[in-house]
């Protein structure tokens, strides 16, 4: 295996060396053309000298001279990736931003998370034209999600057709923007064209011939009076399932056995035949590939956007933006075998409707609306910007092609409405900025100040009765009336800042912010960032800041009840009697300290190198408590959730705790309760390198790029177990699996190297991503997935008359989700399926994907 990695590392080293060589050649040549490479190595125009508006309240910072690491990704960069949406395109463009490639549980397979610097998406703030975009109404954690208690902005809902460019700040910025900006900020800048536009059609499919995706995108700019514009954008994407299976082994039975009289009999553990029975005749025609849970989700997305501006006299401008998205998505769930329906759930009537079992499908219908209107201008020497923003996200969930094993069939439903989640956010904001000439400084002292008011509302609505009664809908139990909730909160903030060039080479920027939230109190944050130009080509930059992540309303009021043959599970609202009885305390904001130190080198206009080291300390990370309760289905052997036999005293302790909340566990039943809580402190350290170069040759322009991210997260402290639980065994605020989810979400390192070529009307791009090893845990057993290389190719041509065409293939060598090694598989998996796939892998199950695109620009 090590030998196989040598060529890969060598090839990346060659790309780096060539890029450095190209930069050195331009530095040596006095006649080098004043061109710079794009941030992602595609054929788009240079972005290194573009003025950026993210991460500072000053107005003259660029990617090159920024005091913090920032990336600018153009619309052309995004399109050249050939990805379905903004989230996937950003993942291709930024090694510091990653996404789990494998299948994720329940709604998380449809509302995808991501990691910036190996941390939860809840720590990344998303802006549109500098205004806060809301997080999803969905909260992760209770149904197998990877980020307990966190909600995040769904980047896939932002229409790519409306985007002019993206600015990604890789640093803490809570002192500028408030909650969530711990690991960074993604600022989506919309198109502001008053004329012209474009229409594109893209289609592709996996190398297996499925997973077909078709996207139609359009933009048009219209004038609004003499000095205004209205930019309209829209897109429609339809993605079909790429079917991937978990194949049952030949010896694994799917149907109940039959006795000598032909009556069905429940199978023994691992679906073995009981004594005196024979296999069901239906086994002869069973489908061993019926379980297609590894298939990619399907969805239909329609997204619209408008960005407008109009002058109000000489000194002011009105501006407005709005986006609307509507997505219906479906994710295939685990197949329900007829043997399981009959034996485990004891629901033979379901076989009247599903005699061969069934494959449930989880469906979400999601609507996202955002809108901002404001006025900005210059009055009395001040630049003033006042705005109002409204955001809303609604997720309605359905279980299709399913059953409730507690109901009688035929007659009971097979499709269920599971309930809705709704999150609304209203923001009023006022920003002021002014430059003051101070003789001691090399540039004006830019002073900024502002105030913000925010109102939030969260609702969880119950589903239909059949979706949650008894066992509930198979695959996703609906929200019950007891789980339903409505909650609101308000917050207000004031902030100040000052920035200047102390000398011609030394830039200094300071900011402070105070916020007060109606539910958990006040938080103060600060930030100091600086840059020193050692020479005209070499600079040093550093930042120190603190930040916070406010516990979402969805996390504070989360409650979900589930039932299965193993018992009833309750994720209790943290302020409920059940949670309080088990030691829950109010959720506190997660607080962070950020430190970064970096250098930049620009020996010529055609070369840029940046190296940044960072440390992020987070205190009070959110997590989920242990499940407290016991299984009394065998009264002679009372066990906890781990299977440990409890003493009479331990059982009595649990009974007493739950009894204070009016909960009792009857003989023959099982019950377990948990809740969200602040579990502990983490430290994330990493190193980021970006190299960009541009080279003129006789046979065209070459654009080189290389980026790498190395990161590591460690657990610094685990909070104490509540006193009321300390006499119980196996109570942990941070289990081993939870620790792995926190520490090893991403590979140990990621490298991305790209080469773009342009000659006349022809363009081509190749980029390779080298994912380092990643630690994994399955069935309590540690293992490691080895490094892997993914290659992407694309080419395009200008056809004349505004027409262009492109072809590409992503994942050329068809790398797919890898297997869990045999020694880490559970006995149940070994006895039932041929292969256990690593659903936490960076690789997806889809494999190679080709696409073609036609674009018309007018």
Please report, for each region that a protein language model flagged, where it lies by residue.
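Gram-negative outer-membrane beta-barrel transporters
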Residues: 31, 614-778, 857
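N-terminal periplasmic "start-of-domain" segments of outer-membrane beta-barrel proteins
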Residues: 47-81, 108, 137-148, 197
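Extracytoplasmic beta-strand/coil segments of soluble accessory domains associated
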Residues: 59-60, 91-137
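N-terminal periplasmic accessory domains that precede
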Residues: 86-89, 93, 114-115, 127, ...
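Short acidic/polar hinge/loop motifs at secondary-structure boundaries
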Residues: 131-170
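C-terminal beta-signal and adjacent terminal beta-strands/loops
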Residues: 136-137, 618-619, 712-715, 769-776, ...
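Outer-membrane beta-barrel transmembrane domain signature of Gram-negative proteins
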Residues: 350-352, 358-371, 390, 402-507, ...
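Outer-membrane beta-barrel signature, preferentially recognizing the C-terminal barrel domain
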Residues: 482-491, 537, 547-618, 667, ...
């Amino acid at each position: 295996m090590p030998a196989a990695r040598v060529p890969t590392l060598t090839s990346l080293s060659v790309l780096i060396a060539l890029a450095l060589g190209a930069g050195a050649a331009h530095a040596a040549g006095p006649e080098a053309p004043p061109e710079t490479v794009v941030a992602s190595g595609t054929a788009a125009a240079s972005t290194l000298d573009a003025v950026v508006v993210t991460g500072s309240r000053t107005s003259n910072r660029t990617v090159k001279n920024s005091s913090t690491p920032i990336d600018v990704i153009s619309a052309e960069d995004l399109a050249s990736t050939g990805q379905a949406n903004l989230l996937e395109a950003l993942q291709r463009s930024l090694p510091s931003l990653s996404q789990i490639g494998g299948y994720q549980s329940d709604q998380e397979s449809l509302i995808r998370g991501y990691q910036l610097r190996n941390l939860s998406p809840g720590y990344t703030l998303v802006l549109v034209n500098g205004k806060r975009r809301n997080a999803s109404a969905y909260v992760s954690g209770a149904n197998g999600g990877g980020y307990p208690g966190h909600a995040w902005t769904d980047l896939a809902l932002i229409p790519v057709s409306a985007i002019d460019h993206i600015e990604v700040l890789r640093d803490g910025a809570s002192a500028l923007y408030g909650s969530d900006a711990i690991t960074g900020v993604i600022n989506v800048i919309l198109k502001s064209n008053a004329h012209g536009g474009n229409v594109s059609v893209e289609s592709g499919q996996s190398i297996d011939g499925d997973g077909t995706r078709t996207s139609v995108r359009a933009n048009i700019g219209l004038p609004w009076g003499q000095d205004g514009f209205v930019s309209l954008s829209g897109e429609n994407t339809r993605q079909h399932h790429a079917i991937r299976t978990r194949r049952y082994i030949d010896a694994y039975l799917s149907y109940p056995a039959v006795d000598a009289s032909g009556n069905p009999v429940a199978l023994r553990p691992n679906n073995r035949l009981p004594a005196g029975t024979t296999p069901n005749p239906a086994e002869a025609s069973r489908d061993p590939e019926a379980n297609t849970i590894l298939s990619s989700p399907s969805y239909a997305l329609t997204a619209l956007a408008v960005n407008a501006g109009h002058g109000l006299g000489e000194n002011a401008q009105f501006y407005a933006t709005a986006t609307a998205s509507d997505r219906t998505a479906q994710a295939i769930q685990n197949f329900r075998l007829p043997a399981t329906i009959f034996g485990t759930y004891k629901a033979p009537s379901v076989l009247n409707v599903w005699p061969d079992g069934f494959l449930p499908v989880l469906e979400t219908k999601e609507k996202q609306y955002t809108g901002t209107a404001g006025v900005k201008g210059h009055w009395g020497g001040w630049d003033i910007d006042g705005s109002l923003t409204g955001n809303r996200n609604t997720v309605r969930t359905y279980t299709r092609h399913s059953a409730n094993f507690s109901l009688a069939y035929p007659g009971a439903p097979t499709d269920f409405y599971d309930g809705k989640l709704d999150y609304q956010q209203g923001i009023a904001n006022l920003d002021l900025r002014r430059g003051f000439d101070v003789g001691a400084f090399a540039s004006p002292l830019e002073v900024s100040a502002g105030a913000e008011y925010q109102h939030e509302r969260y609702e969880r609505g119950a589903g239909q009765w059949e979706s949650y009664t008894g066992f509930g809908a198979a695959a996703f139990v609906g929200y019950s009336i007891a789980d339903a909730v409505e909650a609101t909160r308000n917050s207000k903030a004031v902030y100040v800042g000052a920035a200047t060039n102390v000398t011609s080479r030394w830039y200094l920027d300071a900011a402070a912010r105070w916020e007060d939230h109606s539910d958990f109190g006040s938080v103060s944050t600060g930030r100091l960032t600086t840059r020193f130009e050692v020479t005209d080509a070499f600079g040093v930059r550093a930042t120190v800041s603190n930040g916070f992540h406010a516990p979402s309303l969805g996390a504070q009021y989360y409650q979900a009840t589930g039932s299965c043959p193993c018992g009833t599970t309750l994720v209790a609202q943290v302020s409920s009697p059940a949670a309080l009885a088990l030691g829950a305390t109010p959720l506190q904001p997660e607080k962070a300290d950020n430190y970064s130190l970096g250098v930049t080198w620009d020996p010529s206009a055609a070369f840029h190198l940046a190296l940044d080291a960072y440390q992020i300390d987070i205190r009070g990370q959110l997590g989920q408590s242990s499940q407290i309760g016991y299984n009394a289905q065998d009264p002679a052997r009372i066990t906890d959730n781990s299977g440990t036999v409890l003493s009479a005293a331990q059982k009595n302790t649990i009974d007493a705790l739950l009894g204070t909340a009016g909960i009792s566990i009857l003989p023959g039943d099982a019950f377990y309760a948990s809740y969200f809580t602040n579990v502990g402190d983490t430290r994330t350290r990493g190193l980021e390198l970006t190299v960009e170069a541009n080279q003129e040759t006789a046979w065209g322009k070459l654009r080189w790029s290389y980026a790498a991210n190395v990161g590591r997260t460690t657990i610094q402290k685990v909070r104490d177990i509540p006193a009321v639980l300390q006499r119980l065994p196996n109570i942990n605020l941070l289990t081993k699996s939870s620790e792995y989810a926190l520490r090893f979400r991403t590979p140990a390192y990621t490298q991305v190297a790209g080469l773009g070529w342009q000659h006349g009307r022809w363009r081509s791009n190749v980029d390779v991503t080298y994912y380092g090893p990643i630690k994994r845990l399955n069935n309590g057993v540690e293992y490691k997935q080895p490094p892997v290389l993914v290659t992407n190719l694309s080419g395009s041509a200008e056809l004349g008359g505004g027409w262009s065409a492109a072809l590409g293939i992503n994942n050329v060598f068809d790398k797919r989700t890898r297997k869990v090694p045999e020694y880490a598989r559970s006995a149940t998996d070994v006895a039932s399926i041929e292969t256990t796939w690593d659903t936490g892998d960076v690789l997806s199950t889809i494999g190679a994907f080709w696409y073609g695109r036609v674009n018309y620009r007018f």
